[in-house]
Regions:
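Face-selective signature of the C-terminal outer-membrane beta-barrel domain
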Residues: 287-314, 338-481, 485-491, 497, ...
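Surface-exposed extracellular loop regions of Gram-negative outer-membrane beta-barrel proteins
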Residues: 475, 500-545, 566-585, 704-720
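Short acidic/polar hinge/loop motifs at secondary-structure boundaries
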Residues: 131, 165-190
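Short, acidic, small-residue-rich periplasmic hinge/interaction motif at the N-terminus
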Residues: 15, 29, 64-68, 82-122, ...
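Extracytoplasmic beta-strand/coil segments of soluble accessory domains associated
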Residues: 132-165
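Short, acidic Ser/Thr/Gly-rich low-complexity loop/linker segments typical of extracellular
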Residues: 33-48
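N-terminal periplasmic accessory domains that precede
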Residues: 83-88, 102, 128-133, 150-151, ...
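Outer-membrane beta-barrel signature, preferentially recognizing the C-terminal barrel domain
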Residues: 512-561, 568-570, 590-604, 725-733
Length: 769
């Protein structure tokens, strides 16, 4: 191939052959006769692209876009700058129908939204989490809190993927946002992950990478408190291989955390009233996560990936409180000291193989193994004014392991995508318990979990649909006996495109859920001088059903989504309090907290999201308001709660500067068993400045507050009602500095999409009592 003495450019406009509309986000490459990519670009919002500094006389221009036939054009460039004019791409006849629902690069498919980040969105973002915060206006149900580094979909958890491979949030944050080709967003549970309780999937499809690599370093340092978060990531590509390393570190020490509580114990001759007055307490958290990854691609249709990761955690809490107790006419006051420690480490190995047999079928195989070892201590020390003391020390030693195998076959039949999968998982937890120096007593539990599933997604006229079914076989074996269940899951969605502005989406989910191993441990643990905690081997799986409907409206840069949902959990898993009034019982006159099946819990929710992007070309505004009603029915009592919640956020852009804010007007409530929980208030505002390969930022968290981080819970009960408020003053008016450094280097090389997942381990340990 001849080399030009003077560099030229190649440009053009890519349009849809049928509609004649420009296609934004088309991936454009310049390829030599050896199929090596020399340079690449993407079309802008008007479908235009330009390849600059071309110094070869002849080459091929390749164009690729999801849902369209790829195209390769031979070009001769020795005559000077070349304008290819309009280039027409033809939609694939075998692809699912799709509708561009706005001018902002959003494609609504049967089972997901496909979003193409604009150049402005990419330039404004300092990293991937910041990009999601800007683009959430186009992603119904997505919530982002940059200060907490928390992402949720429809109020639930998220599975992150990179080119279809499941990754951690820290890995996603290490991506160079300019290398993101598109984002595939699902705000419905994938049947593959439905047994994990997640509400959505966010998949980042990356541009073909260059031989060479990337390095990213990010530091979050609080200057008004002791809090530090660091991430170091690197990836290197060479020929058919990819090596990656990702290290994350979180260190935090609080010296001003408080826990207030009001409790009643009902059952004895006189009600026991306890008022807990929080005193300055301390907490130290130190966690380290490191992962090493390797990917080998035999060809574009065959690949093998491996990942070895290690997590270590060391936590220490020292809680001090003053207790006021009233029993009849008697009043007492005592000091309560409650230290606890947690230390654990866990290595994990993932292996993954994928083979694409054709454009319509593929096979994925995944094997995972992990082990966990940890030591946990929980102490309770009371010092009464009368001079008497109460001391309790609980120790737990844990050794656990888990292994999983999964196979997934994907097949396209005409215009319908289908998947068929099976997953087998074995989880073994072995815990040894000791109280007050007594000999350790063992507890062993093993759970076998066989999960098989299938789904299909298609489109009929304007109606997109997905239907999924799955079956789960549980077998749980412990020292006290064994239980087994066979349960089925079902998931269905309907997505109807009303017109160019309106669309409606309906979801139905039926999901049985097995309790965690810790809830099925019937060993008795001492909480304090008058109360105990135990699990229940014979609790049954709960059954969760949900109906959700939302209507979406979009015109220009304005987005509005109205939501309504109803869910019910039958045989709900609740922590129920009892008073033992049997004189012959071992636990006579003790209050016992035991895991039981309740009748049901109900949740009715409404929500309205309003957003406007690029107001005056500088400002993005978002607001959400909603109402939740919860009903909890146990065998002996009924409780309910209804609350209104609201939040607002804003991002403003001025050149290389970004100013942002997130504020909770009224916090949302959730339900955990029988406990009503007010969401954590963690508001912030800040600014970022981008300079070359750096981003510098500063933000204030929980500004103009005295308590800072605050969480409230309410547990109604006829035996032991509890009201708690936990807050960390260290996080009040907290100032954080952020630095991101990212650099990429190398030549271009095409990689295949892949999936690699690790679902963690259930240790069976519960120290939250």
């Amino acid at each position: 191939m001849a080399i030009l003495g003077k560099a030229h450019s190649v440009s053009g406009v890519v349009i849809d052959e049928q509609t004649k509309e420009p296609l934004p986000g088309v991936y454009v490459t310049l390829i030599n006769d050896s199929a090596k990519v020399l340079m690449s670009s993407t079309t802008n919002g008007n479908g235009w692209f330009s390849l600059k500094d071309v110094n070869v006389a002849e080459a091929f221009v390749g164009l690729g876009y999801m849902g369209y036939e790829t195209q390769k054009i031979m070009v001769n460039i020795d005559g000077g700058d070349l304008d290819l004019g309009e280039i027409k791409l033809s939609p694939k006849s075998t692809m699912l129908g799709e509708v561009v629902v706005s001018a902002d690069n959003v494609i609504e498919k049967a089972d997901k939204y496909v979003l193409i980040p604009t150049l402005a969105e990419l330039n404004r973002a300092s990293e991937t989490l910041n990009l999601l915060s800007e683009m959430k206006v186009k992603m119904p149900g997505l919530q982002v809190n940059e200060a907490l580094k928390r992402v949720s979909v429809d109020g639930g958890g998220v599975v992150f993927q990179v080119n279809g491979k499941e990754e951690s949030l820290s890995k996603v944050q290490s991506l160079n946002q300019h290398d993101i080709l598109r984002i595939e967003y699902r705000n419905t549970p994938d049947i593959r992950y439905a047994d994990r309780g997640v509400s959505g999937v966010i998949n980042f499809i990356m541009k073909p990478r260059q031989e060479g690599g990337t390095i990213m370093v990010e530091l979050d340092e609080a200057v008004t408190s002791l809090r530090s978060i660091a991430t170091i990531a690197g990836t290197y590509y060479y020929k058919k291989s990819e090596w990656s390393i990702n290290y994350g570190n979180t260190w935090q020490k609080n010296t001003k955390q408080y826990s207030d509580a009001q409790e009643q114990y009902i059952g004895r001759e006189n009600i026991i009233y306890r008022n807990q007055i929080g005193q300055p307490s301390s907490m130290r958290d130190f966690s380290n996560n490191v992962s090493l990854g390797y990917t080998y691609m035999y060809d574009l249709n065959t690949m093998l990936a491996a990942r070895l990761s290690f997590r270590a955690y060391d936590g220490n809490n020292r809680n001090y409180n003053i207790m006021e107790e009233i029993i009849g006419d008697a009043k007492s006051r005592y000091e309560k000291f409650n230290p606890n420690k947690s230390k654990s480490h866990s290595p994990t190995l993932d292996l993954y193989f994928r083979k694409n047999f054709s454009q319509t079928q593929s096979l994925e195989l995944n094997a995972m193994g992990t082990i966990s070892s940890g030591d946990y201590s929980r102490e309770m020390h009371y010092k009464y004014d009368s001079g008497t003391d109460f001391n309790q020390i609980n120790l737990t030693n844990n050794d656990s392991w888990a292994a999983a195998l999964e196979a997934l076959y994907s097949l396209k039949i005409g215009k319908v995508d289908t998947r068929y999968g099976v997953n087998y998982r074995r989880n073994h937890a072995e815990n040894k318990y000791s109280e007050n120096g007594a000999e350790f007593t063992p507890d062993r539990q093993t759970r076998d979990n066989l999960y098989f599933y299938g789904d299909l997604a298609g489109k009929w006229n304007k109606l997109g649909y997905t239907f999924s079914v799955g079956g789960k076989y549980f077998h749980n074996t412990g020292l006290s006996g064994s239980e087994h269940y066979l349960k089925f899951k079902a998931l269905g969605t309907l997505n109807f495109k009303i017109d160019k502005h309106w669309s409606a989406n309906y979801l139905y989910l039926y999901s049985p859920d097995m309790p965690p191993l810790s809830a099925m441990n019937d060993d008795v643990h001492t909480i304090d001088d008058i109360s105990l905690q135990m699990g229940n081997l014979y609790i049954k799986p709960s059954t969760y059903q949900r109906h959700r409907l939302y209507v979406r409206y979009n015109t220009g840069n304005f987005y509005a989504t109205g939501w309504g949902s109803y869910s019910r959990t039958d045989n709900s898993l609740n922590s129920v309090w009892y008073y033992d009034d049997n004189p012959s019982s071992k636990y006579y006159q003790m209050f016992i907290n035991k895991t039981e099946n309740g009748n049901y819990t109900d949740n009715i929710s409404t929500q309205l999201d309003l957003s406007y992007q690029n107001l005056f070309n500088h400002l993005t505004l978002s607001a959400s308001v909603g109402w939740d009603k919860y009903n909890v029915s146990d065998k002996a009592e009924y409780n309910s709660l209804n609350k209104v919640w609201a939040s607002i956020s804003a991002n403003a852009y001025f050149g290389n500067w970004t100013v942002y804010a997130n504020y909770t007007v009224a916090p949302r409530y959730s339900l955990d068993g029988r406990t009503f929980c007010r969401d954590i208030r963690f508001d912030y505002f800040g600014a970022k400045y981008r300079w070359k390969d750096f981003s510098f930022g500063a933000r204030m968290v929980n500004a103009f507050t005295k308590r800072g981080f605050q969480q409230e819970t309410e547990t109604p009960s006829k035996v032991h009602p509890i009201s708690k408020t936990f807050y960390i003053k260290d996080f009040a008016n907290m100032v954080e500095l952020n630095i991101v450094y990212r650099i990429s280097f190398g030549k271009s090389y095409q990689r295949a999409n892949r999936t690699l997942q690790n679902k963690g381990i259930d240790t069976g340990v519960n120290v939250e009592y």
